[in-house]
Design a protein with these regions (language model features):
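Negatively charged, low-complexity tracts enriched in Asp/Glu with abundant Ser/Thr
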Residues: 1-39
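A conserved amphipathic terminal alpha-helix motif
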Residues: 73-104
């Protein structure tokens, strides 16, 4: 699932940590984060984030279990725009979207 948050006002890694994600690594400007849903580490949300100006581009999926097939490219993940992924996307958007300025 992919979406974008516009006009972020804080560091992307800080925002995602606040949302419960743990930084894993950065590769060519793309950061990898995970948020386990169980103490064993799986299932977990696996998120890739990249900044473009003031915008944060997010791509994530749900890993159901660890890779069990060596160097194969198959993946035990869910990518649909419904169910648990949609709920997590909505949760992330509510946390990451900057609040509009207030007039006093």
């Amino acid at each position: 699932m992919k979406f974008q948050i516009n006009n972020i006002t804080e560091n992307a890694a800080t925002l995602l940590r606040r949302a419960g994600y743990t930084f894993q690594y950065e590769d060519h400007g793309e950061m990898s984060f995970v948020r386990p849903l169980a103490t064993a580490g799986y299932p977990r949300y696996h998120l890739y984030a990249k900044t473009s100006g003031l915008n944060l581009e997010i791509s994530f999926h749900l890993d159901q279990k660890a890779h069990t097939y060596g160097n194969e490219t198959r993946h035990h993940g869910e990518y649909e725009n419904e169910g648990a992924l949609k709920q997590e996307a909505d949760r992330l958007k509510s946390i990451l979207t900057p609040l509009p300025p207030t007039d006093y």
